[in-house]
Amino acid sequence: RPIYKINGLKSLNKKINSLFGNLMIGLEYIFKRTGPMTMGASQLCMFAKSDPSLELPDLQWHIQPMSMDTLGATKNHDFHAFTPTVSNIKPTSRGHVSIVDKDSRTYAKIKQNYLSTDNDRMIAAKGLKLTRKIIMESETFKKYSPEEYRPGININDDEELVKEASNYAQTIFHPVGT
C-alpha cells in the first residue's frame, strides 16, 4: 500500500483524526446525506498492464483519499495524503485453509502465502514502479507536489520493492479468488 503526501488538496486524514471532524462528518450525513459517510473507501479504480505485451490488465488500483500505517489498526496520518493500493489481479501464489481439529469452535489455520512465486514478486515490483511513475511524472498530479511517503523514493531495487510490498500485503475488496 504505497502512500503519497499531497499539497494544495485535503485528504480525509485530519478530519477523521479529530473528534470535531468526526462530528462534522456525522452531521453532514444526517442533515445533507452527503460527505464521507456516503462513499466507499476507494474513490477511484484503475486497471493497467504490468507488461504491454499482455492481452488484458493484470494490475488494479483502489485509490483512497486517506492514509495510515496499518489499515484498520492505526490512526490516519496527521498530514494530507492518499493511498493508491495496487493489486495483482492474476496472482500465481496459492494459499490454503486447513481444519485444525474436530472442534467447530477452533479457528481454521489460514496460510495466505502472498508473493510466494517469482511471477507475483516481479508484478509487485512493477506495480509499485508504475504507481510511482503515474503519480510522480504525470501532469495531473504535479500541481499537488506529491511526495512518496511509502515505500520511499530511495527504494528502487526490485527486491527492495518486493520486501516493502510484503510488509504491507493484505487482501482487499475481493479483486480475485472470491
Model-derived regions, located:
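FAD-dependent oxidoreductase catalytic-site/capping-region signature
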Residues: 6, 10, 16-178
